[in-house]
Amino acid sequence: FTVSTAGNTDMLIIGGGGAGGVGSGSGGGAGAFLEISQGYLSSGTNAVVVGDGGTGQAVPSSSGSSAGNNGKASSVGSYFAPGGGGGVGGLLTTASNLYTTINGLNGGSGSGGAGGTVASGSSGGLGVSGLGNNGGLVAVGILRAGGGGGGAGAVGLSPAINDAGANGGAGKSSSITGSAVVLAGGGGSGAGTNGGTGGSGGGGNGSNLKTGVAGTVNTGSGGGGANQTTVNAIGGSGGSGIVIIRYAV
């Protein structure tokens, strides 16, 4: 982005969303939501990067789980918005063929904690203060359901009962284009009976089957988690981020 005369401008910078996990998989976290009023840009070329959403990772064998990748950061010059945390899946224990819970991953907004068939509980990943929110935790005693990914406007939710997915955290509104639009929702989690709903602003829905729903492109939203641990089961990819620069002409 080339600036002829140094000065201040309004910017919205959102990182790419994290992908959902597989195996009572948690929802991916939204990318960081950085809105700047009258931020300074120097004259000359200011590098602009729009972060990709994290990709879902397919289960490589006949039984197992997988974690989604974190989203990539977006930036304008020195202004930086990290990507969202990738969702996680319950860890297969070879001795008993049970799935233990795993804590969510940190990011712009954190992913939810994974569920499992061992009721040990898990924590959601941490979001960046002021730019995102934490993912939803899974309480001790809850089985086969992950936590929702954090959204820019709210924390990811936690599953209330066995086998019922948790919703992703709500996105956040911006009026930088002149009209209010909600972006950067968290992904819903996978679960045994029904997946959680993605957060407003483009979060992907979770699934009780083998494929989570992707976050919406150019919203920085998290992807939905998947439940089944069969070969090629995959979490939904995170939505790519977005950069908007508003300046006088």
Residue ranges of model-derived segments:
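Short amphipathic alpha-helices and their capping/turn segments at secondary-structure boundaries
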Residues: 1-6
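Low-complexity, glycine/proline-biased repetitive segments and flexible coils/loops
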Residues: 8-249
